């Protein structure tokens, strides 16, 4: 969705904390005070910088084999989360340099789980994304190393992906996940040749929304929270306590700037794409990665043609088959990689973002903290009180890796009040939600040949409730969603999870 050139960003002249409800962005807890972390702008920035530094891990190269920071969630869910984020939010107007009013921001994506990041404006308006039949997506050049039918995304002469949302080419993994959605759509067309394009779209969206409700949320959010939003086993709109809208759902900043930034803690230092040793790559090529022994000379950055040998072997990202968890060196190269645990640590590379990705600041944890402060988010403790939840004590808000056994070489885990006195009973909402997850752990049986369980933190009563209510609200507020059109609908295969979606796209 593009902004008309003659119009400024909606509400850009509004005073902070506007009472309007109908912007694309807004607040869940409008009466709560903004959290401050200093008396001056410099003090706020300095204190948040200190916290961001404590949340940033030391350099750790991507390797094969099991990893103590892994959760029981296969790695592809991290990038499904990124894909979903691109489906519902795009805010090019908010700033890290000045205070922002959420009511003044425009979401340039529809705040709905409608796959507009896949379909764009449709074949009539964006025919260059589709084949001549006007129903199926164009696919790109062939990739090797993984799935034999793998292709890159279609690209312009400048190697830019011709897709519904260019952000889905940000890295090699989300780029190839976008390609799977294209192939899922194309196979749905082939299996239903008489259905018109609109009905094909609906069928694909239903599978996507069903997977989100019955798989994605279940893995990330504590089960008791999800059950509390149901009546007789079915999600009910009347169960939403905190997310309310007048005409159309908006995008709450407590979700987009805090709760749904959980995925940043799930990112690994790098990933292996397939058997080729050149495809064990860091997410970003930092100076430390270049100096590693052996050194890395490339990374998983996107916005370029995917190398021909970089087709993803999807069994390394999702359990489309069953592999050995921890075996010989050769077996470890083929193992299923798992997302890192939801905790208050972020891998080193995300604190050293390349200039092409972000700058001023280049550290993702600091960018998140500054954005929350600039948008006037309340503290985690204030939000907990407003939700009727007993807040975590400062001693419970731990900063560092949420592993079972600390590595002596890692910085010690410390409580938030030891970072700076300004954070006593005043934790930034994003950090609070991550810390809360460290107290809501499940032992997850992972889909491998051995019998293995892994400690897996999940979003708790503050972060999980915000995330669940917003996802459900976006679906209840969309007249064309699964929950409104056919809430009893189920896929042909049940239970239906991300691996089933991937297998269908792969032609299995």
Describe the function of each predicted region.
Residues 182-191:
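Active-site nucleophile-adjacent alpha helix/oxyanion-hole segment immediately C-terminal to the catalytic cysteine
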Residues 1-167, 171-172, 190-508:
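Terminal regions of secretory-pathway proteins
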């Amino acid at each position: 969705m593009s902004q008309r050139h003659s119009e400024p960003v909606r509400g850009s002249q509004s005073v902070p904390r506007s009472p309007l409800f109908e912007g694309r962005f807004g607040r869940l807890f409008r009466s709560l005070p903004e959290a401050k972390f200093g008396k001056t702008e410099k003090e706020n920035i300095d204190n948040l910088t200190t916290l961001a530094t404590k949340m940033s891990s030391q350099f750790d190269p991507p390797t094969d084999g099991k990893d103590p920071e892994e959760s029981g969630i296969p790695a592809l869910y991290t990038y499904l989360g990124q894909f979903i984020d691109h489906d519902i939010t795009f805010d090019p107007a908010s700033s890290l340099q000045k205070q922002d009013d959420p009511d003044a921001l425009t979401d340039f994506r529809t705040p709905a789980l409608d796959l507009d990041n896949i379909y764009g404006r449709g074949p009539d308006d964006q025919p260059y994304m589709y084949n001549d039949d006007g129903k199926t997506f164009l696919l790109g050049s062939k990739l090797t190393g993984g799935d034999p039918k793998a292709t890159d995304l279609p690209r312009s002469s400048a190697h830019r992906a011709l897709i519904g949302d260019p952000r889905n080419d940000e890295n090699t993994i989300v780029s190839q996940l976008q390609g799977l959605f294209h192939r899922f759509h194309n196979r749905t067309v082939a299996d239903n040749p008489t259905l018109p394009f609109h009905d094909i779209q609906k069928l694909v969206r239903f599978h996507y929304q069903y997977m989100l409700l019955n798989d994605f949320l279940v893995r990330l959010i504590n089960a008791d929270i999800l059950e509390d939003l149901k009546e007789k086993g079915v999600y009910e709109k009347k169960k939403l306590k905190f997310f309310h809208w007048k005409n159309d759902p908006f995008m709450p900043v407590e979700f987009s700037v805090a709760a749904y930034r959980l995925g940043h803690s799930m990112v690994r230092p790098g990933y292996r794409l397939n058997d080729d040793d050149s495809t064990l790559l860091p997410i970003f090529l930092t100076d430390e990665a270049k100096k590693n022994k052996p050194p890395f000379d490339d990374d998983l950055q996107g916005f370029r043609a995917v190398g021909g040998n970089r087709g993803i072997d999807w069994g390394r990202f999702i359990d489309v088959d069953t592999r050995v968890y921890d075996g010989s060196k050769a077996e470890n190269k083929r193992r299923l990689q798992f997302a890192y645990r939801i905790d208050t640590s972020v891998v080193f590379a995300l604190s050293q973002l390349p200039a092409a990705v972000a700058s001023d600041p280049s550290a993702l944890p600091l960018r998140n903290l500054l954005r929350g402060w600039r948008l006037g988010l309340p503290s985690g403790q204030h939000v907990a009180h407003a939700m009727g939840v007993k807040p975590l004590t400062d001693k419970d808000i731990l900063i560092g890796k949420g592993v079972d056994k600390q590595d002596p070489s890692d910085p010690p885990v410390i409580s938030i009040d030891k970072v700076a006195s300004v954070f006593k009973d005043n934790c930034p909402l994003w950090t609070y939600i991550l810390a809360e997850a460290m107290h809501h752990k499940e032992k997850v049986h992972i889909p491998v040949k051995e019998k293995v369980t892994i400690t897996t933190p999940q979003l708790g009563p503050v972060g999980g409730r915000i995330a669940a209510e917003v996802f459900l609200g976006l679906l209840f507020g969309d007249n064309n969603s699964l929950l409104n059109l056919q809430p009893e609908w189920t896929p042909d295969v049940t239970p239906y999870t991300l691996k089933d979606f991937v297998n269908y796209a792969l032609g299995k």
